[in-house]
Amino acid sequence: MARRILMCGALAVTVFLSSPALGDRTARTAAASQVGAPAETVRAIAPPTHPLPAETASAGVTKFSFIAYGDTRGRQDGTALQYEHGLIVDSMLATIKRLDTTAAPVRFVLQSGDAVVNGGDARQWNRSFVDLINRLTTGAGVPYFLAPGNHDVTSSADLNAAARQNGLRNYLAATAQLIPADGATRRLAGYPTYAFGYGNTFVVALDSNIAGDDTQFNWIKAQLDGLDRARYTNVIAFFHHPVLSSGPHGGSTVEPATLAIRTRYEPLFRQHHVRMTLTGHEHFYEHWVERYQDATGPHRMDHIVTGGGGAPLYSYQGEPSTKDLIAAGRDSKVSFEHLVKPGPAPGDNPYHYVVLSVDGDNIQLEVIGVDWGRGFAPYRSAKLQLGDGGR
């Protein structure tokens, strides 16, 4: 772990940097230690005081906001509350309060994974994560939805691996009062895979660590196949591994989970005109725009990487190749634009989260930098209109 001193006016800020090699060793150590973690029961995060209504009850809602972010794991997980994540939560609470009396209040929060360093260690959930999220669910009253990251349930594609099962058990305990119940219509039984609808927007959460799993894929496909698109004009998917990224997990590297997302879910998402993917894994902000055509005309899918939730920051490592994606989508005339690239140093990429404001089939995005990152303007401003109805 190295340090970099940033000068912000008269204020010197120390940023701790994590090299890709160190990040890889940390992930391997976390996975290896999960089996032998102490037997402590994970406390359930408190349910929101203002839960989402039944899907049918919100059918007429076309204007609201929600928050997205990811990668909150901290350097002191298991011994203290996550400090950097706490700064994020403080800012979120202020944003939720600011928007509460507007026409587009914040109705839920999405977290794309890596809640803690070692998801198999109950102490890390209990001492570093749960109480921070309680501030959102009880203090602000908003529903909170978490997708599992590789640090939460390991990156193993083997559903029965002991380390994965240990992490999954803790994840499910923490989220027991937040996500649909096991066996519910909007939950895949036995999996951390679920969906929900609010107003004109439908959200699917999947476990990208097992993106090659047939049972999960078929369930997601069935959810999308059966969707009332007259009502749900906006469909959003959130999960951990990005489709494209230019950090230590991307660039010339294509991880197995990423490859499975590209080959299996990308065509499915285009088929169903998914508006946006919200991911993390890379600890910075990045934005890709995918354009394609089908019998209904031109379409756009925004791929947002928002992994600035408190984990050690990453930097730009190189462009990923889009050649195979473009070749696979040749019939749909698929193309990609790298709209926002992360900076070349971790200190260029602040802790942040994203506010998405829905107004009919239009979505506006605002990136909010935190602490020394206040004023972060990746689009020469902090806001961007995401096309007209996904086109």
Segments and roles (model prediction):
Residues 1-9:
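Bacterial N-terminal signal peptides that target proteins for export
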Residues 36, 328-391:
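A short C-terminal boundary segment appended to hydrolase-like catalytic domains
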Residues 8-17:
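Bacterial N-terminal signal peptides
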Residues 19-34:
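Signal peptide processing junction and immediate N-terminal pro/mature segment
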